From Swiss-Prot:
Its cofactor is Ca(2+). PA2 catalyzes the calcium-dependent hydrolysis of the 2-acyl groups in 3-sn-phosphoglycerides. Does not exhibit detectable activity toward sn-2-arachidonoyl- or linoleoyl-phosphatidylcholine or -phosphatidylethanolamine. Binds 1 Ca(2+) ion per subunit. The lineage of its organism: Eukaryota, Metazoa, Chordata, Craniata, Vertebrata. The gene is PLA2G12A. It comes from Homo sapiens (Human). This is Group XIIA secretory phospholipase A2.
Amino acid sequence: MALLSRPALTLLLLLMAAVVRCQEQAQTTDWRATLKTIRNGVHKIDTYLNAALDLLGGEDGLCQYKCSDGSKPFPRYGYKPSPPNGCGSPLFGVHLNIGIPSLTKCCNQHDRCYETCGKSKNDCDEEFQYCLSKICRDVQKTLGLTQHVQACETTVELLFDSVIHLGCKPYLDSQRAACRCHYEEKTDL
């Protein structure tokens, strides 16, 4: 059996130590990468669940904008509301150009209401329903035709139901943009 010289033995031991260190590093890197992948996956699930909660009515099902510390939100300094978009929702890629100016006016007022810090979704939706139903009453007075009123009421009901069932996320997003909470920074929308 050949004996290695002292320098060769030292070199061999250094090489073996380097190999062991590389293997440990590879295991550590894989372990860290696995944890990072798991963390990113959990974060994505959390993001999707929060979006679903916003869409379906918020945490309590009531669709209310609240500060996490329980304080009342206040208007964001210098906030400029976005221009109203008529009847539609960019969230769902829907824009309804119905061609009835008074209907578009109701939708625009509703958008502005959602962007008024501290205004409840319920109050905005009730004002919207009143505005829409007034259009149908005016159609009845002007035309006196029942079939036009029924078509108007069907359109109003469809719009209002859409707002009630799908309007939570747009409301919460508008409140987040228009309001500020003490001790909180604005988060990305």
